[in-house]
Amino acid sequence: MKVGAMLATMLLMMCTASAFATVKIYDDRGGQIGEYLAKYRALRVSGEQVVIDGTCASACTMLLGTIPRNRICVTPRATLAFHAASPTPDGNEVSREGSQILWANYPPDVRKWISRHGGLRPRIIYLHGAELFAMYPVCH
């Protein structure tokens, strides 16, 4: 009987710990869109919180439309970097399909900000500071 109670307690502690788990993003330069979508869909289901505490660039930014907003917070060090998708490492070629996938994974206020700053192009645009804090809560 004691073993059963102990196992039940351990299981409860494990569930509680995972319910309050946090994923921190410090320096994520992005990568393959498909890999990031799969990672963020799994993260969405996990219920984990996301703290952006540094650079989140390119495919990393798709978390904004994949993870519920109430589970994302940013620190004063947070910087989001947006650009058009590129199938080549040098970034000189633009992938229209990849850029459409990025765009579809941004919430409306982020799309509006991107549009005001020239849209998704090969040149990187940065969202940070007061403009970012107006969209996402500052982590406490």
Regions found by a protein language model. Give the residues of each.
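N-terminal signal peptide c-region/cleavage motif recognized by signal peptidases
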Residues: M14-S18
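Cleft-lining beta-strand/loop regions that shape enzyme active-site pockets
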Residues: T22-A78, A84-T88
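Charged, glycine-interspersed solvent-exposed loop segments at helix/strand-loop junctions
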Residues: K24-I25, G34, A38-V51, D90-H140
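N-terminal targeting/assembly segments of extracytoplasmic apparatus and virion spike/baseplate proteins
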Residues: V3, F20, L127-H128
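Bacterial N-terminal signal peptides that target proteins for export
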Residues: M1-L7
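Short, surface-exposed, polar/charged, turn-prone segments marking secondary-structure boundaries
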Residues: A78-A81, P108-V110
